[in-house]
Structure formats: structure tokens, C-alpha cells
Amino acid sequence: MVSSFTSAPRSGFYYFAQGWKLVSQPRIRRFVILPLLVNILLMGGAFWWLFTQLDVWIPTLMSYVPDWLQWLSYLLWPLAVISVLLVFGYFFSTIANWIAAPFNGLLAEQLEARLTGATPPDTGIFGIMKDVPRIMKREWQKFAWYLPRAIVLLILYFIPGIGQTVAPVLWFLFSAWMLAIQYCDYPFDNHKVPFKEMRTALRTRKITNMQFGALTSLFTMIPLLNLFIMPVAVCGATAMWVDCYRDKHAMWR
């Protein structure tokens, strides 16, 4: 069945909501299972451990608040918690995406075919295994782009005043953009679009992608919901690809 995803591009909020609808389509569910299992096992275990450590980490982070800002501690404490959740959530979602990258690519490919009626390459399980080195190279490209920027932002957390006020906001914006790159890259990579060209394409609709990435980042911090976010975000990003980028960048139709 060909979907009606041929209308004008919508907001990033719309595509995120579509991800929740598309992930449950009958012919798509079987491609959701493996990414979902990876995410449940890794994110579930990681966040369980995180919540056992918060009572140690948050006081440590708050100790960097200078005396002249202590009167704002009742506001800075929630910011400190959100900061830890943002950094921790993005770190482990990155690991989960590395592990599940081949299956996320397959999910994006099959959903795109479902939405457009196009015929994807007949890859199969052996095709996926053969493509793993190229997929992992692509993940390394994303990591190499992300790491130096993340290090600079993490250093800001240790600057008194800035680390408890400005740094959390900057990290949220950065993680929103990086998650948009992470999930939108699956359909782009299925069509062998170079990483640099993909980033350039996303910048042409930066607000849409920031909206999508911001919601993905927020849901990554929410217990239980974050267990399902990976396949949902892949589906939402694929819907965005079909509406916004496919006409210009598609390799197969």
C-alpha cells in the first residue's frame, strides 16, 4: 500500500508524531523488533543504573555552583538533573544506535518502500551483513564529527556559573541537532548520500530538524518511553526523508 506521504513538508513535531503511528504498521512491525530489543536492553539497563547514582552525581555537580549563585540553587538543582539525563541519554542512545545501525537502516528502507511504493534493493540478511563495514564507517564519521563539539560543551559544565546555567541549554540544542543527524542519516545512507551532503541537506530545513531532534531528545530522557524511541525516531525520520529530501537524493525509485 502506498502512503499519502506526498504532501508538502510539515513540522518536525508532525514527523515525530508520525513515527509513533508508522512503527505499528503491520508490515513494518517485524523490522522494528531487533532495534526495539537493542534499545530496551541497553537503555533500560543504563537508566536503571543512572537512577541509582543520581544522589551522588547531582551534589557533586552542584558543588561547582559559586557562592554568589547559591540563592538560585532551587532552580539550578533541576537543571543539574536535566543535564545529567541529557548527557547520559545521548551517550547511551549513541551506543544503541551503533549496535542497531544495520537493522535501523533496514527498517528505514522497508518503511520508505511502504510509503512510496518504490522497490528497494533486495538486500536480505546476507546483504545486510555484507554492508556492515560500510555502515560502521558511516557511524564513525558521525562520531568523529560529534566528539570534538561534545568535548567543548562538556568542559563548559566545569566552569562555575556557566556549567549550571548556559551549558545545559547549549547541550540540549546540540543533542537535538545530533539526534536529527543520527536518525535522518539512515534513509540518506540507504541511498549512499555522502555524510557531508546529508548535513547540508538537513541545514536547508534546520528548524524542522531541530524540532524533530528536540522531541527525540526529550523522550530519550523519559523512563519507559525512552525504551521505544529508537524505532519511532527512525520511522519519523524516514517519513521526513520521503516528504523533504527523497525527490532530490533518491538512488532507487
Curated annotation (Swiss-Prot):
Q: Where in the cell is it found?
A: Cell inner membrane
Which Pfam families does this UniProt record tie to the protein?
A: EI24
Where would you find the membrane-spanning parts of this chain?
A: 31-51, 75-95, 151-171, 222-242
Q: State any single GO MF term.
A: high-affinity sulfate:proton symporter activity
**Alphabetical keyword list:** Amino-acid biosynthesis, Cell inner membrane, Cell membrane, Cysteine biosynthesis, Membrane, Sulfate transport, Transmembrane, Transmembrane helix, Transport
Asked if Glycoprotein is a keyword of the record, the answer is no
Where on the tree of life does the source sit, at the highest rank?
A: Bacteria
What is the protein's membrane topology class?
Multi-pass membrane protein
Q: Which GO terms describe its biological process?
A: cysteine biosynthetic process; sulfate assimilation
Q: Which GO terms describe its cellular component?
A: plasma membrane
Relate the protein's function as given in its record.
High affinity, high specificity proton-dependent sulfate transporter, which mediates sulfate uptake. Provides the sulfur source for the cysteine synthesis pathway.
The record, for PANTHER family, names: SULFATE TRANSPORTER CYSZ (PTHR37468:SF1)
Tell me its family: Belongs to the CysZ family.
Q: What is this protein called?
A: Sulfate transporter CysZ
Q: Source taxonomy lineage? A: Bacteria, Pseudomonadati, Pseudomonadota, Gammaproteobacteria, Enterobacterales
Encoding gene (name): cysZ
